[in-house]
From Swiss-Prot:
Organism from which the protein derives: Lacticaseibacillus paracasei (strain ATCC 334 / BCRC 17002 / CCUG 31169 / CIP 107868 / KCTC 3260 / NRRL B-441)
PROSITE patterns listed in its UniProt record: ACT
Cross-referenced HAMAP family: UPF0735
The protein's name: UPF0735 ACT domain-containing protein LSEI_1046
Record lineage: Bacteria, Bacillati, Bacillota, Bacilli, Lactobacillales
Family that this chain belongs to: Belongs to the UPF0735 family.
Record-annotated ACT domain positions: 68-143
Residues in coiled coil: none
InterPro entries from the UniProt entry: ACT-like_dom_sf, ACT_dom, UPF0735_ACT_dom-cont
């Protein structure tokens, strides 16, 4: 299994930053060929190919934490709105919502949301959602 480290760039050889810069030139379309990119940043093609698949900038999107919950909502006006208001109050940023049609007046809902700025714990959120009138079977499905 691979191990990954987060390391301050000042601790790495200068070529690592240049490889990342060369890759960015290629991805952004500023240059068309590897030879142009490496010439522009001042490294050899061999150095680029040696490191290109192993060094990356930290992606801010990957730094966010995600959670998925499932719940059942009674088919009454305003219940989903109250769930979303509760999510907003604790700074849970909704990423996706999937609501099925109500069967016997109950609809299943699965929501994924960003919890990187969550105020409180996931257990508190699950409890708050379960306390809403018309909400039942609140389950935390996964956390990344």
């Amino acid at each position: 299994m691979k191990q990954f480290y987060i390391v301050d760039s000042s601790m790495l050889p200068e070529v690592v930053g240049k490889v990342i810069a060369a890759r960015a030139l290629l991805q952004n379309g500023e240059v068309k060929q590897v030879s142009e990119a490496v010439k522009q940043v001042g490294i050899s093609r061999g150095t680029y190919y040696k490191y290109k698949d192993y060094v990356f900038l930290r992606d801010p999107e990957m730094a966010s934490r995600k959670a998925v919950i499932s719940l059942m909502l009674h088919h009454d006006r305003g219940i989903l709105s109250e769930v979303l208001t509760t999510m907003s109050q604790v700074q849970a940023s909704i990423v996706t919502i999937n609501q099925n049609i109500p069967i016997h007046n109950w609809a299943s809902v699965v929501m994924s949301f960003d919890i990187s700025a969550l105020q409180g714990t996931l257990d508190d959120l699950v409890t708050k959602l379960g306390d809403i009138r018309g909400v039942s079977d609140v389950h935390l499905v996964s956390v990344e």
